[in-house]
A protein has these predicted regions:
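Conserved alpha/beta catalytic core and glycan-binding cleft of carbohydrate-active enzymes
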Residues: 103-198
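Short catalytic-loop micro-motif centered on adjacent basic/acidic residues
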Residues: 85-91
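Acidic-and-aromatic substrate-binding clefts and catalytic sites of carbohydrate-active enzymes
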Residues: 91-97, 122
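Substrate-binding/active-site clefts of carbohydrate-active enzymes
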Residues: 1-81, 101-110, 114, 119, ...
Length: 198
């Protein structure tokens, strides 16, 4: 059914963006049964899986077999379902090299495929690295690109972490649940659009 929907939208000139979550999952998943400990980031000599996402065990996207899985999964979705692009949940936890490989994989099939995501850091002390591996945080994205689009440098897009943080600081809220509350939060007189975002 999803394939049919995607095809119909494509026939009418509308591309679907699929939300994907590769950064975390339960450590009781099939991956951990295949190769215990390999697919997850750990601390304390492999005894504790990390949970920087706050949503489950962090996936070791820097490991070759996980990178391969992500690229194969995106390739299948792009070839079979014809998705126009992908929005990556907590992309800042995904290895930069894995995002680069993902970009190349999908743009080899369709150079117009869009990749973007949440490239923010998990806290103020996060330096965008995990044990020597650069992650796909906002300031590392300019190091990636694809030559697939007739020599055009394809890029991975990101939601602006600085803007997001400024909104949270300015409004005093970590989450604004409605348009009404957003307009109230921004009607205090200070213009958030003149605040530094980077």
């Amino acid at each position: 059914e999803l394939k049919e929907v995607s095809m119909k939208y494509n026939e009418n000139g509308i591309g679907l963006i699929l939300d994907v979550v590769y950064n975390h999952m339960s450590n009781t998943s099939t991956f951990n049964m295949l190769v215990p400990g390999y697919y997850f980031r750990t601390e304390n000599y492999g005894q504790i899986t990390t949970n920087f996402s706050g949503a489950g065990s962090d996936v070791a996207t820097e490991r070759e077999m996980m990178k391969n899985f992500i690229c194969q999964n995106l390739t299948t979705l792009t070839e079979e379902y014809k998705f126009a692009g992908y929005r990556f949940d907590l992309m800042g936890l995904i290895a930069k090299d894995t995002m680069q490989a993902a970009l190349e994989s999908v743009q080899e099939i369709d150079p117009d495929t869009v990749l973007y995501g949440e490239a923010w850091t998990m806290d103020d002390n996060w330096d965008g690295n995990w044990k020597g591996h650069e992650l796909a945080v906002q300031w590392n994205l300019n190091k990636m690109g694809s030559k697939a689009n007739n020599g055009f440098q394809g890029v991975v897009g990101a939601f602006n972490d600085g803007f997001r943080t400024s909104v949270k600081v300015f409004t005093g809220k970590t989450f604004i649940p409605s348009i009404t509350e957003a307009s109230e939060a921004f009607s205090e007189g200070t213009n958030i659009f003149f605040m530094p975002f980077w």
